[in-house]
């Protein structure tokens, strides 16, 4: 997949291969892995994974665990029935599993995940009813969501997190900080990098990049009063795994929207070199690969 989890996984795979390990990657039909077949909409994800494990006979299975990537179902009546489409894989797999957790939330942040989704068929009433339903299912399932994480750390199952925040919420996990490094070396001159994106050379630039989702705070950027001498440069990418349909237009003279979608590692690195600062207006976050990328580029 494109985006943060995909890049994190690719960097890990490349590092393991550099150490002489044989690595097989399982992804969805659009990915470039060795096997495919998993998706948020496939209720048989566990069967797909168990079949591959039987065929490959690995020493260790590593799962990039972002719940929505495998299909998460919050039961509105019985929280014990809340699950993802890979729970039975964890129950039945006899090979040791290492899970990298990408999401865990405090109760306040968990409830902030509920965002209004416009209902074209029933209008404002439909939007309100859907919001009420989502609030109820989130309120009912906060503990069951956390238990999905906790159940994945047992005697032959280990968990990895990349921030102290996640480590506190997922007890028993091992903290390994999220790595990052520039994809262009040596560093490019800032003005030279800006010319490649047709960005102003005499103003300070605050950079905001990431998925076009409501919890990333793009609406905050649209309302910002940008100080003189500064521009906020935005580059969003489509979220293929959510239902949100957000406007990607920023009616703010202090905001420059590149509107280039997903960037290659090289182009993303060049974009970081354009910036004087990184802006993260997140409303909800468990961790931020963008933040680590920014640190790697001296921001």
Predicted regions, residues:
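Short N-terminal targeting/anchoring amphipathic segment
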Residues: 52-81, 96-100
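N-terminal subdomain of nucleotide-sugar transferases
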Residues: 1-32, 56, 91-95, 149-154, ...
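Acidic donor-binding loop of glycosyltransferase active sites
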Residues: 270-286, 296-299
């Amino acid at each position: 997949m494109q985006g943060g989890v995909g890049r994190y996984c690719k960097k890990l795979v490349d590092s393991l291969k550099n150490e002489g390990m044989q690595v097989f990657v399982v992804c969805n039909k659009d990915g470039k892995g060795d096997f495919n077949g998993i998706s948020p909409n496939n209720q048989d994800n566990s069967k797909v994974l168990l079949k591959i494990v039987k065929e490959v006979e690995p020493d260790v299975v590593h799962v990039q665990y972002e719940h929505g990537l495998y299909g998460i179902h919050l039961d509105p009546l019985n929280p014990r029935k809340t699950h993802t489409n890979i729970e039975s894989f964890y129950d039945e797999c006899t090979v040791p599993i290492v899970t990298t957790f990408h999401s865990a939330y405090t109760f306040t942040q968990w409830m902030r995940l509920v965002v209004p989704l416009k209902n074209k068929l029933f209008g404002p009433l439909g939007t309100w009813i859907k919001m009420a339903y989502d609030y109820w299912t989130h309120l009912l399932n906060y503990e069951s969501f956390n238990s999905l994480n906790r159940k994945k750390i047992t005697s032959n199952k280990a968990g990895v997190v990349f921030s102290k925040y996640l480590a506190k919420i997922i007890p028993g996990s091992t903290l390994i900080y999220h790595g990052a490094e520039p994809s262009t070396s040596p560093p490019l001159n800032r003005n030279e990098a800006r010319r490649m994106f047709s960005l102003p050379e005499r103003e300070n630039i605050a950079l905001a990049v990431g998925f076009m989702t409501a919890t990333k705070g793009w609406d905050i950027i649209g309302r910002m009063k940008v100080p003189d001498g500064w521009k906020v440069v935005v580059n969003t990418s489509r979220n293929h795994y959510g239902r949100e349909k957000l406007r990607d237009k920023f009616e703010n003279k202090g905001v420059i929207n590149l509107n280039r979608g997903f960037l290659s590692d090289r182009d993303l690195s060049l974009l970081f070199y354009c910036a004087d600062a990184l802006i993260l207006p997140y409303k909800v976050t468990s961790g931020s690969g963008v933040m680590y990328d920014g640190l790697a580029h001296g921001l």
